[in-house]
């Protein structure tokens, strides 16, 4: 009888925990989906307005000054995606005012033509929302960390329209090698709910029709070579992002002046480039590359534009610029390797995303959700090669890699 009672108590504990998280995660997903959808629509409107009024580019220096003033006014200076990862790692508290700060700053960056994405900002908004919902629901420190992951999944899912990749990105990006699988069911719930909410807002998920060639040994070998190139480009991109930020902070101590000069530099670069392809997120360039058309120098120019924009204090994200760089590099390199240009662009996106984020499972899932499963083996090969060959560099310095990429060894290092 005692054994039966113990078994019953054991089962009820798991059922209660599951129900608690299903309800909590659904709440986070509902709010996160709504906020993420509004954020998506805001960035979309800012992009359309900038396209209709090209002269807004010349307001970029002023936008930079306003962003610095906004962050100082809300006392959120120095708080970014790394702080969200630290909140999961160490339970550090996130300021609630980070949400309006990154929301408005990203809109200003896109409105005036800074080269940035939105998913990095979404991770900050989602992580902050999740953590504060956890506190509102009187969760303890450990559960608040899972709530933070739920928020990250929800916002990523709402913006990207890739609910499975959103789940594993939140679980995978914090600590490479060990995943918080206790957060699997909560993150799936919040991600699916947020995705459903985004559809109700009329947000169309990112999907591309990419034809995959027949998978054979030669195709896989070509994909592996392309993945090696993606790994090298990801190292270059990460180095440019980090070194540009450190260099500008050292050369120009005043935050306002740094943002102002950064805006002026982006204007100068735009005039030199002779087009607006490298301002904003560049979604049309990604679509063109996946259609088989890209300038061979486009990936290098996007790296420079993004490094200057984010390094000088503008806000947004690095994920969509990563897709831009990956698609244009893949499209250009595919012609040299004998791969179909559009398919090579898809492989480039997969390889760059993996190399920049150190998240191979997420990269594989995102490729399937964006492009379909026809080229699954090629995407898997690209993820494997890019993950190993990109070394220990990454977008987020608070990301930890617990196990060596080269051997079965515990190393516990931060990305460079």
Predicted regions span which residues?
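Alpha-helical transmembrane segments and immediately membrane-proximal extracytoplasmic
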Residues: 1-416
């Amino acid at each position: 009888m005692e054994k039966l009672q113990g078994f019953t108590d054991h089962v009820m504990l798991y059922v209660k925990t599951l129900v608690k998280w299903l309800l909590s995660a659904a709440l986070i997903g509902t709010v996160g989906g709504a906020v993420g959808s509004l954020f998506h629509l805001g960035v979309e409107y800012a992009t359309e307005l900038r396209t209709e009024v090209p002269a807004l580019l010349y307001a970029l220096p002023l936008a930079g000054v306003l962003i610095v003033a906004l962050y100082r006014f809300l006392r959120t200076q120095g708080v970014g995606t790394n702080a969200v990862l630290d909140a999961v790692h160490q339970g550090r508290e996130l300021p609630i005012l980070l949400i309006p700060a990154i929301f408005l700053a990203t809109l200003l960056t896109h409105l005036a033509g800074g080269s940035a994405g939105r998913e990095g900002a979404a991770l900050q908004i989602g992580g902050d929302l999740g953590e504060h919902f956890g506190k509102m629901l009187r969760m303890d420190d450990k559960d608040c960390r899972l709530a933070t992951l739920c928020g990250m999944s929800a916002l990523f899912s709402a913006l990207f329209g890739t609910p499975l990749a959103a789940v594993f990105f939140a679980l995978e990006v914090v600590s490479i090698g060990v995943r918080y699988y206790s957060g699997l069911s909560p993150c799936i719930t919040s991600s699916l709910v947020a995705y459903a909410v985004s559809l109700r807002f009329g947000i169309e998920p990112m999907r591309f029709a990419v034809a995959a060639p027949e998978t054979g040994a030669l195709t896989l070998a070509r994909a592996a070579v392309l993945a090696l190139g993606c790994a090298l480009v990801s190292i270059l991109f990460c180095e440019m992002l980090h070194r540009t930020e450190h260099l500008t902070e050292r050369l120009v101590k005043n935050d306002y002046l740094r943002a102002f000069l950064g805006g002026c530099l982006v204007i100068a670069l735009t005039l030199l480039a002779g087009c607006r392809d490298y301002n904003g997120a560049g979604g049309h360039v990604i679509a063109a590359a996946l259609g088989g058309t890209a300038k061979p120098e486009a990936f290098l120019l996007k790296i420079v534009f993004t490094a200057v924009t984010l390094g000088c204090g503008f806000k947004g994200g690095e994920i969509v610029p990563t897709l831009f760089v990956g698609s244009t590099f893949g499209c250009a390199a595919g012609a040299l390797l004998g791969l179909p240009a559009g398919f090579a662009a898809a492989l480039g996106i997969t390889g760059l995303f993996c190399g920049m984020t150190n998240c191979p499972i997420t990269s594989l899932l995102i490729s399937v959700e964006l492009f379909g499963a026809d080229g699954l083996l090629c995407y898997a090969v690209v993820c494997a090669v890019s993950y190993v060959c990109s070394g220990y560099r990454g977008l987020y310095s608070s990301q930890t890699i617990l196990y060596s990429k080269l051997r079965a060894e515990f190393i516990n290092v931060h990305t460079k």
